[in-house]
Amino acid sequence: MRVLIDTNVALDLLGDRRPFSESAAKLFELCETGKIDGVVSATTVTDIYYMLRKMIDRETLYSVLEKFLSVVDVGDVTGGEVFGALKSRNADFEDAAQSECARSCGADYIVTRNEKDFIRSKVQAISPNEFLEKL
């Protein structure tokens, strides 16, 4: 099963944002052990760097990102995904781009804590806890 992991869930893990970090850790453990195929969008990686750069020194942050990216694949956000996001007219453009990335990389689900922003998505959005219960 292939899942696109939304930025907020990745930040829950890497920023140790409790109480959400527990379910995020379980999700990434499934990726690490190969039980699921986890994907983050290319924009998620830049967002993570931007959000954590004031909390973690640069070298440590690069190491954290390298380890993180050894566990998940990076999905492209190219012109096709950007134009698809624009066409969707979603109120949250960033989430529309995530949705398009999920579609183009063949994800079965988008795992996110803000499912309401993905109502118009072609790929079903599901919370980390709901996803873990499905397995």
Give the label of every model feature segment:
Residues 25, 45, 52-73:
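Active-site-proximal, substrate-binding regions of enzyme catalytic domains
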Residues 1-40, 53-60, 120, 132-135:
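Short, well-structured N-terminal submotif of metal-dependent ribonuclease cores
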